Amino acid sequence: MGFTVDVAGNCLIGDVRLVLEGGDQGLCAWSLDGIDSGGGIDGLATHRAFGATPAAPDRPAGGRHPNGVVAIDHVVVTSPDPVRTINALQAVGLEPRRTREHAAMRQTFFRLGPTILELVGPAAPDGDGPARFWGIAFTVADIDATGRFLGNHLGRIKDAVQPGRRIA
């Protein structure tokens, strides 16, 4: 998909280091700098990162990726009980910044440094299952160039809700 990955399986994207390991597909766990969760946050496998940052004085943050990705815009988590997941996130020191409710769905947003956590779930609890990682949204330098690079692997480019932004 056009990401630059080093021999140790690290992929630097902006201020975030993705560690690619074998096994399950998709986002399986995360490490949050300074957050001690005891191993999990409402079912989300969570490890504590101590001052981990890919940037160093002799190396700028992020890597150069042929797909044009320059940052992680947001990570999406789903939960059958968003209030329970919000409480779990607050218990480790994360505070909601904004909540949007429409129809039968609720979205709550948290800031994780330069990256946003978007929690999505039903407006009313719908089961007692754990929260799950659902997806990652990337920021690219030039969405048209990324579209040409990825071809059919990228959805249709369209205007975003935010003025002046486009998404795919």
Residue ranges and their predicted role:
Residues 101-104:
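Structural preference for solvent-exposed beta-strand-turn elements
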Residues 108:
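Aromatic/basic-lined ligand-recognition segments
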Residues 1-97, 111-168:
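Glyoxalase I/VOC metalloenzyme domain signal
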